[in-house]
Each structure stands twice: as structure tokens, then as C-alpha cells.
Amino acid sequence: MAATGTAAAAATGRLLLLLLVGLTAPALALAGYIEALAANAGTGFAVAEPQIAMFCGKLNMHVNIQTGKWEPDPTGTKSCFETKEEVLQYCQEMYPELQITNVMEANQRVSIDNWCRRDKKQCKSRFVTPFKCLVGEFVSDVLLVPEKCQFFHKERMEVCENHQHWHTVVKEACLTQGMTLYSYGMLLPCGVDQFHGTEYVCCPQTKIIGSVSKEEEEEDEEEEEEEDEEEDYDVYKSEFPTEADLEDFTEAAVDEDDEDEEEGEEVVEDRDYYYDTFKGDDYNEENPTEPGSDGTMSDKEITHDVKAVCSQEAMTGPCRAVMPRWYFDLSKGKCVRFIYGGCGGNRNNFESEDYCMAVCKAMIPPTPLPTNDVDVYFETSADDNEHARFQKAKEQLEIRHRNRMDRVKKEWEEAELQAKNLPKAERQTLIQHFQAMVKALEKEAASEKQQLVETHLARVEAMLNDRRRMALENYLAALQSDPPRPHRILQALRRYVRAENKDRLHTIRHYQHVLAVDPEKAAQMKSQVMTHLHVIEERRNQSLSLLYKVPYVAQEIQEEIDELLQEQRADMDQFTASISETPVDVRVSSEESEEIPPFHPFHPFPALPENEDTQPELYHPMKKGSGVGEQDGGLIGAEEKVINSKNKVDENMVIDETLDVKEMIFNAERVGGLEEERESVGPLREDFSLSSSALIGLLVIAVAIATVIVISLVMLRKRQYGTISHGIVEVDPMLTPEERHLNKMQNHGYENPTYKYLEQMQI
């Protein structure tokens, strides 16, 4: 009988254990944290997470994880710390049985009862923000998302900030969306109480703010007077009590009770809490409480309090400490640094500029919002909807110009009716007046259109460059991965080729549009367009040739590469055929016919011979000059030098508004350098022989002639295109064209990611 009972009890225990495991499965993060606490505690099961609390002048407090109660410092000597590292060390001392790895400031303040001063028996309650002692590996908090609320997260690996900074960031993020912060947590620790990001929940704002009633405030004041006139804490309650909706404005008051008992002044904290509005209208009652009927505070009253705080002058106070702080300067409309003495002062006293601006930003006059699509376009930065916003702005500009012209036309007609009986000379003067008005309007419209187009082209150019640069860096990173993954390399290569193709297609569309609208201008820019396309082609081929470093991967994805290049080649062949029908420069046309051969599959790595030291014929150009980096700088970096040297779009530049991409600007030195590069590579492919001295002489003469031609064009056309800043470089006639081109690019400070990759491979 006893055995049967024991078996039944064991079965029941196993069933309860399985049920418990099933219920706790969705909360793996919390279970893992409790597991870590239980494993490290050694004695008993932890019912609370380890925390410590500090208040200058009082003994440090820590939570007993077995009882959940606050206990004073066991040594009876330690008080507040100055650095987070000291806080971490104290956590490790208080919880030696736990593996404390970091500390983090809590989101909410807590009230600690019977908190005694150091070396005294005065014990009072105190509100304070504790520090959490994090156990083991960092686990982010689990955030609940109520109905009609939204979850967000921010991660910036280049930023490593403390808890207070991210709190300010998420508050601002919620406010910009017309919502208020509900809860938040830290992500990705990068130091002691420092993190790379945060996650947070925003909820709709409410119109009525619940607060402590007047009667409760009076009772609190009476109780505080009985407790030696302790500081008054006005806590405005929220319908969502999980958010730390109480913010401190300053730490600046002297505890008057202790002045009579102690010889020196002891600085304590005067927490003045600021209320953050929360929740949506759906949380209100059917009959919302009327402001003022039960002591509630409205948004208007909160704004009045903020104005009263932020309009105060900065006060150092009577103490002589040196504490850098921030205050809001009403005359300047921004937060300014000042030195706080450590006591006294007023509430216009903040620990950081971000915190100061977050509280006092209501004091800054709002910037007038743009009234039409044109102003909106100029006021906002580029994004994925750049083209659509540009089209709207262009249409708005045309409507504005048309309305102005209609108004002038109407005035002109009315003036003609009234001037029928005037002498001919006066009528002629009237006509000239309105003609001048029309001409001025046309000129103004052309100027506005030019500014709009230049802005659009600059933004598109920047977007194309950024996308290509990111795609190339990802491709190089995939090649450097150990071991290389063919699928990942192919995926990164596709993105890179697609980015290059977008640049190429925009350039082609640009030229085709100019050719249809202004053939003369198209003839002038033809060589520039073809040079730009050649640079794109060479840069892409050189990037593809990097696959030689991992030949077995390249052989595996060879077919996919051929298909990818065939798609790109089809559009290029069509454009080459169309552009060859309107030859402008015989030399350029013949060059392009040689530079763009019919499509053939890309094979950068033939079957490797038995001698692994022998490299494919494709890499012969890399043996010239100063090594691998020259081809890298000459091909991949050629376009980057021109783009990076264009600091801004020239204001005198006239471009049609329908263009979708930049017009590349190459001066004679730039074009000459590229032509020298092509002519220097030619002998390697075609095997014709020229003496090096004759070749150098011809190249120098060509560069001189091209320079004279370009200078003449600049003087005639007043340099309509954006200027490119080139330093004065002494050209050594004994250098090869590749070396001269590399020197020019290095003088401009350019260094591309492929060069770094090849340099690392050599090391």
C-alpha cells in the first residue's frame, strides 16, 4: 500500500513538472535569468534580482535576493560612489556567490524605508533610482506591448552610451511620433552601464492626467512636517504604472534638519519629479474627469510648469563644488553649460544637454512648416521616395509658374484695354514693361527649376555612390570570410553588379535624354559619358577578377556569373549601337567599338596548371607599375576620385529637370589619364610594338593638346559644370601611365576597399 502511494506521488510530481515546463516555455529569457540566479546563489531560491541603491550621506543599500528586502551596507561605512566601475565592484562584493558581469540603472525609482545616515540613527524613507546587478550573460528585458501601442528598437554599433542617454533618445523618438514612452530596455552592452542600442514601446497620449488629489497632498505635507520637514515629492500617477514617468530635474538642496546636528553642510538630493503623459484615448472613461474638478493637471498646466523652470537664470549656489551642468538660456534658445556648486540653485539645472533640451524644447519657437511640395522637398533629406518627391516638387513648381504667368497675362490684357487711346509711344512703353515682367518671371522659374534639378541630381548621385560602396564592401567581406561561402559570395556579387548597373543605366538615360533635347550638348558630353561607362565596366571586371583568390568557389558559381553578365551586356550593346549612329569624335567612337566587344562568358580563372605559381593571363597588367594596388586604384578608384572631389553642384549649372542621375565631369587631365591607361594596356593584348620613349612622347603631347582644348572651352563656356580640385603634381616622364594615374589618385587622398583587401591578402 505504501509502495502504491509512493508511485502515485511520483507520477503526480512528474505530471506537475511537465505542466510547469509547458507553462514556462514562452518565457525562455526570464527562465534563463532565474536559472542563472538559482545556479549562482548556491543557497536557497532567489525571489528578487540583485540591486543596490545609493544616496550621498546615507549607507548603501542592497536587496537580499532570498527575502526581497533592502538591507544596509554590512560594513556600515560605504556610501555613494563616483563611477560605474565602483558600482560594479560593490555589486560583486555584495553578491559574491553570483557571477555579476555588469550593472544597469533601473527604469523606475523605488521607495526604501528606514534608510539611515552614516554614523547616525536617523532613518527615513527615500525615493531613489537603484542599479541592477546583472548576472551572467546579458539578457534584454521582455517588453509588453498593450493594445494600440507600438514596439520599436534602435541599434547603432558605432555609439556606446549609458542608460540615461538612451532613455532621452527613446523619449524623443516617441514624442516625435505624437506618442509617449510606455516602457523600454537596453540592448547590446558595450561597457559598464553602456549599451549599443535600446528597445521601447510607445503608446498614444492621453488628454487627462491622473494625479494625487489635493487632500492627499495636504496629508503628505502634514506627515512630512512631522518627519522633520523632509523634502516634498509630488508624484503624478499614470494609468500605466510600469513606466518611469517620474523625472528628476536637479539634485540641489540642503537637509536643514542635519545642519543643526552636524558641523558641516551635507548635500542631499531634492528630487523634483516631472510628469510624462501616457496612454491613448481608449483608456479614458466614458465620462472623462474634468480638469480641476479633482485636482488633476492638464497639459496646459504642465507647459506652464516647464516654462517656469526653463526661464530661470542659472544659479551656482552657495557651495564650492565644481560640477559641470546645463541650463536653458531663454535668450539663446538653447542649453548652455555652467558650473554648479553642489547645493542650492534652482531647477534649471540638468546633468546633460540632451536631458535639458528634452525638458525645455517647448520654450523654442516652432519652425514654420513648409507650405508646398517644393519647400517640403528642400526641407527634407533624401530617402527611398526621392524620385516621387522630386516629381511632386517639379509639378508644384510648374503650377506656381503657370499661375504667375496667368496673373501677368490678365494684367497685361486689362492694361491694353485701358491704353487704347494712349499715344503709340506710351503703348510701346507699356508693352516693354510687361515683356520685361514676363522675361523676369521666366528667368526666375528657370532659376528655381535649376536649383530643384541640381538638388535632385546631387541626391541621386550620393545615393548611387553609397549603394555601390556598400555593395562592394559586402562583396569583399564575403570573399574574405573563412571559409568562403559560394552562395553568400554570389549573392553579394549580384548586389554589387546591380548597383553598378543602376549607375550605368542612369548615365545612359541621361545621355539619351540630352541627345533628344540638345544634340549639340550631347556631342560635347559624349566622350565623358563613354569614359564613365568604361570606368564602370573596368571597375566591375576588376572586382570580378578578385574571384581568382578563391578559384574553387568561382568555378562553382561560373554559370550564374555568365548569366548575370549576359543580362548586363544586352543593354550595353543596344546603347552602343544607338550611340554609334551619331558619331561625334572618330577617335572616341573607334575606341568604344574596341572597348565594348560582343558578349562572351566571363572566365577569370582557367583551369589551374600543375604549377600553382603560374597565374592566368588576366592578371598580367597587375604585374606592371607598383604592384597589385595600382590596378586597384586605377580601375576601381577612378570614378570615386571624381565623385569625391565634387563638393557641391555649381550654381550656374543648367540641367534639364527630367534627368535622373549626375553628368560626370572629367577634365583633360582626367580623360588623358584614362586614355593613357587604355593605350598602355593595349600592347599587352594586341602585341604591337612601340618603343617606350616614343609612347611617352606621344602621351605627353596628347595631354598637352587636350589641356589647351579644355582650357579654351572653359574660357568660352565659363565653366558650366562643377569644378574639380586637383593639386599641382609633378609628373615624372619615366613613370608608366598606371603609376602616374595612381599618384594622382593618392594625392587626392582616395583609398578604396579593394586595395585594402589585396594588401591584406599579400600580408
Curated annotation (Swiss-Prot):
<dbReference type="InterPro" id="IPR015849">
    <property type="entry name" value="Amyloid_glyco_heparin-bd"/>
</dbReference>
<feature type="glycosylation site" description="O-linked (Xyl...) (chondroitin sulfate) serine">
    <location>
        <position position="626"/>
    </location>
</feature>
<feature type="transmembrane region" description="Helical">
    <location>
        <begin position="693"/>
        <end position="716"/>
    </location>
</feature>
<dbReference type="InterPro" id="IPR024329">
    <property type="entry name" value="Amyloid_glyco_E2_domain"/>
</dbReference>
<keyword id="KW-1003">Cell membrane</keyword>
<feature type="disulfide bond">
    <location>
        <begin position="310"/>
        <end position="360"/>
    </location>
</feature>
<feature type="site" description="Reactive bond">
    <location>
        <begin position="320"/>
        <end position="321"/>
    </location>
</feature>
<dbReference type="InterPro" id="IPR008154">
    <property type="entry name" value="Amyloid_glyco_extra"/>
</dbReference>
<feature type="compositionally biased region" description="Acidic residues">
    <location>
        <begin position="242"/>
        <end position="269"/>
    </location>
</feature>
<dbReference type="InterPro" id="IPR019543">
    <property type="entry name" value="APP_amyloid_C"/>
</dbReference>
<keyword id="KW-0646">Protease inhibitor</keyword>
<dbReference type="GO" id="GO:0046914">
    <property type="term" value="F:transition metal ion binding"/>
</dbReference>
<dbReference type="GO" id="GO:0004867">
    <property type="term" value="F:serine-type endopeptidase inhibitor activity"/>
</dbReference>
<dbReference type="InterPro" id="IPR019745">
    <property type="entry name" value="Amyloid_glyco_intracell_CS"/>
</dbReference>
<keyword id="KW-0539">Nucleus</keyword>
<feature type="site" description="Required for Cu(2+) reduction">
    <location>
        <position position="186"/>
    </location>
</feature>
<dbReference type="InterPro" id="IPR011993">
    <property type="entry name" value="PH-like_dom_sf"/>
</dbReference>
<feature type="disulfide bond">
    <location>
        <begin position="335"/>
        <end position="356"/>
    </location>
</feature>
<dbReference type="Pfam" id="PF12924">
    <property type="entry name" value="APP_Cu_bd"/>
</dbReference>
<feature type="region of interest" description="Disordered">
    <location>
        <begin position="211"/>
        <end position="299"/>
    </location>
</feature>
<keyword id="KW-0238">DNA-binding</keyword>
<feature type="region of interest" description="GFLD subdomain">
    <location>
        <begin position="46"/>
        <end position="139"/>
    </location>
</feature>
<feature type="disulfide bond">
    <location>
        <begin position="149"/>
        <end position="203"/>
    </location>
</feature>
<keyword id="KW-0812">Transmembrane</keyword>
<dbReference type="GO" id="GO:0005886">
    <property type="term" value="C:plasma membrane"/>
</dbReference>
<feature type="disulfide bond">
    <location>
        <begin position="56"/>
        <end position="80"/>
    </location>
</feature>
<feature type="disulfide bond">
    <location>
        <begin position="116"/>
        <end position="123"/>
    </location>
</feature>
<feature type="disulfide bond">
    <location>
        <begin position="160"/>
        <end position="190"/>
    </location>
</feature>
<keyword id="KW-0722">Serine protease inhibitor</keyword>
<protein>
    <recommendedName>
        <fullName>Amyloid beta precursor like protein 2</fullName>
    </recommendedName>
</protein>
<dbReference type="GO" id="GO:0007409">
    <property type="term" value="P:axonogenesis"/>
</dbReference>
<keyword id="KW-0597">Phosphoprotein</keyword>
<feature type="compositionally biased region" description="Acidic residues">
    <location>
        <begin position="215"/>
        <end position="233"/>
    </location>
</feature>
<feature type="domain" description="E1">
    <location>
        <begin position="46"/>
        <end position="205"/>
    </location>
</feature>
<feature type="topological domain" description="Extracellular">
    <location>
        <begin position="32"/>
        <end position="692"/>
    </location>
</feature>
<dbReference type="GO" id="GO:0070062">
    <property type="term" value="C:extracellular exosome"/>
</dbReference>
<comment type="subunit">
    <text>Interacts with CPEB1. Interacts (via NPXY motif) with DAB2 (via PID domain); the interaction is impaired by tyrosine phosphorylation of the NPXY motif. Interacts (via cytoplasmic domain) with APBB2/FE65L. Interacts (via intracellular domain) with APBB3/FE65L2.</text>
</comment>
<keyword id="KW-1133">Transmembrane helix</keyword>
<feature type="binding site">
    <location>
        <position position="184"/>
    </location>
    <ligand>
        <name>Cu cation</name>
    </ligand>
</feature>
<comment type="similarity">
    <text>Belongs to the APP family.</text>
</comment>
<dbReference type="GO" id="GO:0031092">
    <property type="term" value="C:platelet alpha granule membrane"/>
</dbReference>
<dbReference type="GO" id="GO:0007417">
    <property type="term" value="P:central nervous system development"/>
</dbReference>
